[in-house]
């Protein structure tokens, strides 16, 4: 048999090219180890391809929890991660008031950033933070996880593909299973900035257009303590979009049957809708009628897949040097809509978003 000559130098060069072109693993540090920080940590440790979690910090870090996850670096001060050359990206999951200052610090340190919503409640603060992001050239993704829900994403794809024709009406139903404590409400920024902000983002996502006008109606029908804290617990909000579509958002802080999350887009060629997720798809039919499971009760289980998918999308954007799917402007726009809704509720008339 005739032996083939192998050019070892050429083979080594080819292997080097393959390694050079292979996307690198993205090494993370997390700021904040509360409920959402721990959720993201567990996802990065085992459910997100191409990611590595090196560090997590929190002033009140549960060291026993961190040790159980074998996270190499832990601490109370997030600044220990900013000077670490191994850390490529920082996930900001701290209290909302700390998001913008930490975002600026991370951008100035040259770290890619995944920031939970909201960046801030003040548009000026958000714009200043985004200016630092633009200056640094890093990638930023804002944590509007519901865009990555498989059902909601499928509806959006129907709109984007033109299968529904021109969108005419977007309807979003978002009801919590139980109201938050009044002390939480007092520091939340209000229902529109705390709860409905997800729905304002979803309205933009589904319609493919910007919201131009808001008319908000609100009431205290669930818990009088929420009213005493200066907020509402029930709302209906009508929207106008730049592309001519109309929208309706229904909110309640308490749905006795569970976490009610539904969307519908009606267009010139048809309708697409996504119903609630339930623990099982079983349906019982008997002489009493039809019985099916209640919706999933808690947001962490309802949006379990969405939390993983949004982080995978961020990691893929960093690895492949592509734009993130939820930009800094996507973080700003829902805040402007929420503030317009607050103004509308206060004044009792429609409010232009551009006036904010």
Where do the PLM segments sit?
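C-terminal helix-rich "cap/oligomerization" subdomain common to oxidoreductases
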Residues: 1-25, 89-92, 313-356
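N-terminal Rossmann-like dinucleotide-binding module
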Residues: 2-69
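NAD(P)-dinucleotide binding in Rossmann-like oxidoreductases
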Residues: 27, 220, 225-228, 242-309, ...
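Beta-loop-alpha module in the N-terminal Rossmann-like domain of NAD(P)-dependent dehydrogenases
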Residues: 40, 72-132
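A contiguous active-site-proximal alpha/beta segment in oxidoreductase catalytic domains
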Residues: 97, 120-181
């Amino acid at each position: 048999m005739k032996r083939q000559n192998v050019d070892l130098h050429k083979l080594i060069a080819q292997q080097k090219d393959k390694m050079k072109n292979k996307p690198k693993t993205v090494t993370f540090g997390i700021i904040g180890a509360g409920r959402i920080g721990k959720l993201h940590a567990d996802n990065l440790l085992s459910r997100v391809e191409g990611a590595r979690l090196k560090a997590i910090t929190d002033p009140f870090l549960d060291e026993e929890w961190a040790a159980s996850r074998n996270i190499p670096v832990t601490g109370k001060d997030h600044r220990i991660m900013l000077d670490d050359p191994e850390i490529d990206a920082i996930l900001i999951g701290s209290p909302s008031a700390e998001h913008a200052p930490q975002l600026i610090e991370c951008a100035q340190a040259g770290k890619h950033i995944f920031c939970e919503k909201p960046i801030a409640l003040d548009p000026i603060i958000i714009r200043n933070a985004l200016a630092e992001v633009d200056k640094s050239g890093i990638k930023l993704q804002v944590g509007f996880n519901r865009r990555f829900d498989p059902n909601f994403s499928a509806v959006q794809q129907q709109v984007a593909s033109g299968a529904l024709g021109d969108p005419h009406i977007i309807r979003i139903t978002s009801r919590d299973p139980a109201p938050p404590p009044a002390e939480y409400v007092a520091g939340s920024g209000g229902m529109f900035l705390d709860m409905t902000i997800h729905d304002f983002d979803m309205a933009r996502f589904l319609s493919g257009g910007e919201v131009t006008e808001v008319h908000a109606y609100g009431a205290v029908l669930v818990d009088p303590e929420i009213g005493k804290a200066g907020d509402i617990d029930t709302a209906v909000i009508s929207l106008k979009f730049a592309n001519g579509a109309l929208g309706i958002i229904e909110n309640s802080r308490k749905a006795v049957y569970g976490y009610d999350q539904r969307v519908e887009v009606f267009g010139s060629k048809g309708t697409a809708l996504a119903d609630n997720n339930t623990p099982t798809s079983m349906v019982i039919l008997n002489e009493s009628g039809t019985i099916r499971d209640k919706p999933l009760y808690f947001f962490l289980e309802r949006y379990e897949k969405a939390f993983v998918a949004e982080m995978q999308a961020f990691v893929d954007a960093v690895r492949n040097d592509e734009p993130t799917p939820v930009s800094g402007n996507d973080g700003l726009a829902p805040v402007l809509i929420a503030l317009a809704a607050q103004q509308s509720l206060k004044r009792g008339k429609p409010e232009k978003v551009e006036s904010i």
